[in-house]
């Protein structure tokens, strides 16, 4: 009989735990060597990612996430729910915390009531990214993988690099990257959602944890939530002989998770009528996915896991797949990993491959399908762990035959001493570091590049930011509405503080602005993209009172220069404020999918300079009647604002206006049914004014008009529902455990 070497502290199966047995006494530290691997990986991340903690304005989407944390902290301090509050800063405002995955910002905002919110944001980014290998190890153990397999997966987890750059990889999160911070939060819960779902379809003893982590994943990041529910659909079919019972458990887990996440899902669906679809990115691979041909090309050429380097992770992913397929009949966890890898790979192909068939996926018209790459990455990490241990085990078997040998009659070699086991474990760790050298050296170079750029930005802030801050201090002291500092599609992209465009820098200072486009689901986000800076009528429509432009660049419309500091000049416009009086002389038909392009003619027209606008027939509903039948019969302006007090961050605006004839008082804020209006203290119905603004009709005369945002009002019952579901499952699990104890079953078996 041939002797077979095993990894120290491992099991007889490289990837699965054997039935529970009394553990042998091990005097060697080899038993803890897998945890040493995880610890070394975490320590490496903590060291490499230190620049994340530097306070600089962000170049990527982290700017909006940090701003949401500040906003959440402020609303929580004042006793309000962020979900029912008006987020005013981008896209002419929106109920951002309802339409977007806002739980990470709320949790960080809670921390931000104790410490500085920006500090809370930076530390959350740093710790969630550096400590992520821990949750990968935990996930592997939930699937029943051996300690070494789970630790190997954890060691691989920080080192993925793909062409899209928005999967589970460093580039997705850091300063020179994309800043998909909410995805990072859900990257902690998705592995646990998969692991506990794998267990729950075998035994409901893990159901409460599966429900909790599936629901949390959906609340933290919508696209990741789809991947969490994908496991609920896939895992019942892993064991055909027990299919119906597994399906029943999966239905229970899925239904309970939907109920537990209803506080996010129900408001989102109920108010989706008022959330814009991104017309600019619609139909592109960013929304539709890159398609089977492109994804498979990246996969087989190494660019899905190892872009720009030797495909070391890709190799181990394919080895892991081969091992799992070879052991398909006995290795249930391997079936699970290969199955979820294949399903998420198919999901990543998107509408580019499947076309209208993708409509079967609920809500798919509002998600960016390319983000499903996360599922391919997570399952690939676990498969790479399987592949690494298989290769290591094969190498150890060869070494044992060479160095320990075996007797001529096939008897096993002598037992390996504890000191030898420790030496083998140490060699395995060193070997892992060497094997992954192409990955960690590549990432180290990228981290160095990121660190250098963060340092350069910090240096530029000391001079350039100080100059711009002087102008912003004037803006705050003399409020006149929003600030415009260019667009990503014109001179604004190259008008910078260090490397950060000024329109992004304004966001870091919580300056209400126009120009940082396509950041929210506001109905005005697409019309903002088509803002015509050469049309004087667009400025009051968008509530712009100030222009910040490069020194030497004249104002595109008549304006008065206030001051210049360094390369930055501040101009004030002649018709400032958030509230204006318009005649409405016709109807614009638009939907949430075309409101931007439908508004192009209006935004380019001279009508706005004469304070003429249109009402909107939105999503097939009837428009409010215009205040005038024809613009030709009108003479002069319809009225003006006498006094304005705007506190949009609190959802409150008050104005005193004079109307020369029946007219519409328009608030330059994105339309939402949560807005309420009063005229002279009496409630009045709001009207939708083109492109998608909120207004109220008034008669001739002087009037006091108020606008207040109330928000979605059904959160409390939904919070209670989530709590009841989780408590009920927890109680049922507890009493089930008590019954098993009473029956003499004190320890549950591990899943296969």
Report residues per predicted region.
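Membrane-embedded transmembrane-helix bundle of lipid-linked glycan/lipid transferases
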Residues: 2-455, 459, 470, 478, ...
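Extracytoplasmic
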Residues: 2-9, 14, 61, 75-79, ...
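Glycine-rich loops and low-complexity Gly/Arg-rich segments
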Residues: 110, 179, 283-284, 371, ...
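A short, structural micro-pattern
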Residues: 149, 178, 369, 541, ...
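Short acidic, gly/pro-rich beta-turn/loop elements at beta-sheet edges
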Residues: 150, 385, 493, 581, ...
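Beta-strand-rich recognition domains
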Residues: 204, 639-669, 713-738, 744
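A broadly conserved detector of short glycine/acidic/proline-rich loop/turn motifs that flank catalytic sites
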Residues: 264, 269-270, 344-346, 350-351, ...
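Beta-strand-rich ligand-recognition modules
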Residues: 671-674, 679-724
């Amino acid at each position: 009989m041939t002797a077979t070497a095993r990894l120290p502290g491992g099991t007889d199966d490289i990837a699965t735990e054997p039935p529970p047995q009394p553990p042998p006494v091990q005097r060697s530290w080899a038993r803890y060597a897998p945890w040493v691997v995880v610890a070394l990986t975490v320590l490496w991340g903590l060291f490499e990612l230190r620049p994340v903690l530097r306070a600089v304005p962000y170049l990527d989407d982290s700017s909006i996430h940090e701003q949401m944390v500040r906003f959440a902290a402020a609303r929580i301090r004042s006793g309000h729910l962020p979900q029912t509050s008006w987020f005013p800063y981008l896209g002419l405002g929106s109920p951002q915390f309802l339409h977007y995955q806002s739980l990470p910002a709320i949790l960080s905002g809670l921390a931000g009531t104790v410490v500085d919110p920006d500090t809370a944001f930076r530390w959350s980014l740093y710790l969630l990214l550096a400590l992520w290998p821990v949750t990968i190890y935990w996930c592997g153990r939930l699937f029943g993988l051996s300690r070494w397999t789970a630790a190997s997966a954890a060691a691989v987890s920080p080192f993925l690099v793909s062409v899209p750059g928005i999967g589970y990889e460093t580039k997705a999160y850091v300063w020179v990257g994309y800043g998909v911070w909410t995805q990072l939060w859900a990257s902690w819960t998705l592995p646990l959602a998969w692991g506990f779902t794998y267990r729950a379809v075998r035994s409901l003893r893990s159901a409460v944890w599966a429900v909790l982590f599936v629901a949390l994943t959906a609340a933290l990041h919508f696209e990741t939530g789809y991947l969490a529910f994908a496991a609920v659909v896939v895992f019942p079919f892993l064991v055909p002989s027990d299919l119906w019972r597994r399906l029943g458990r999966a239905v229970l887990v899925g239904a309970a998770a939907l109920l537990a996440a209803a506080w996010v899902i129900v408001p989102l669906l109920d108010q989706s009528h008022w959330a814009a679809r991104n017309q600019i990115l619609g139909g592109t691979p960013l929304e539709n996915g890159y398609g089977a041909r492109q994804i498979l090309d990246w996969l087989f050429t190494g660019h899905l896991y190892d872009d720009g380097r030797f495909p070391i992770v890709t190799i181990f992913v394919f080895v892991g797949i081969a091992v799992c397929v070879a052991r398909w009949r006995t290795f249930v966890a391997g079936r699970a990993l290969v199955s979820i890898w294949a399903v998420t790979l198919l999901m990543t192909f998107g509408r580019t491959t499947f076309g209208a068939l993708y409509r079967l996926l609920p809500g798919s018209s509002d998600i960016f399908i390319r983000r499903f790459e996360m599922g391919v990455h997570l399952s690939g990490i676990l498969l790479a762990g399987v592949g690494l241990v298989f290769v290591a085990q094969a190498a150890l078997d060869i070494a044992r035959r060479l160095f320990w040998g075996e007797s001529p009659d096939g008897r096993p070699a002598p037992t390996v001493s504890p000191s030898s086991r420790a030496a083998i474990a140490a060699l395995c760790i060193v070997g892992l570091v060497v094997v992954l050298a192409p990955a960690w050296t590549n990432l180290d170079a990228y981290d160095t590049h990121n660190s250098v750029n963060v340092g350069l930005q910090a240096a530029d802030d000391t001079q350039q930011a100080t100059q711009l801050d002087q102008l912003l201090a004037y803006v705050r002291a003399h409020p006149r509405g929003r600030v415009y500092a260019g667009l990503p599609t014109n001179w604004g992209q190259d008008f910078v503080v260090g490397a950060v465009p000024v329109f992004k820098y304004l966001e870091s200072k919580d300056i209400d602005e126009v120009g940082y486009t396509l950041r929210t689901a506001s109905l005005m986000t697409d019309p903002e993209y088509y803002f015509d800076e050469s049309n004087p009528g667009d400025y009051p429509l968008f509530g712009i009172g100030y222009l910040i432009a490069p020194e030497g660049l004249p104002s595109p419309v008549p304006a008065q220069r206030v001051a210049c500091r360094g390369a930055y000049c501040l101009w004030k416009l002649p018709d400032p404020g958030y509230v204006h009086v318009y005649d409405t002389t016709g109807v614009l038909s638009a939907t949430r999918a075309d409101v931007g392009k439908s508004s192009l003619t209006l935004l380019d027209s001279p009508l706005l300079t004469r304070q003429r606008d249109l009402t909107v027939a939105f999503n097939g509903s009837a428009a409010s009647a215009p205040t005038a039948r024809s613009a030709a019969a009108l003479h002069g302006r319809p009225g003006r604002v006498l006094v304005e007090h705007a506190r949009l961050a609190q959802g409150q605006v008050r104005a005193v206006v004079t109307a020369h004839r029946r007219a519409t008082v328009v608030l330059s804020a994105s339309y939402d049914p949560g807005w309420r209006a009063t005229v002279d203290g009496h409630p009045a119905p709001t009207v939708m004014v083109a492109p998608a603004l909120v207004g109220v009709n008034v008669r001739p005369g002087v009037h006091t008009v108020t606008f207040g945002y109330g928000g979605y009002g059904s959160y409390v019952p939904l919070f209670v529902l989530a709590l009841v579901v989780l408590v009920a499952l927890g109680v049922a699990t507890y009493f089930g455990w008590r019954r098993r104890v009473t029956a003499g079953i004190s320890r549950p078996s591990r899943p296969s």
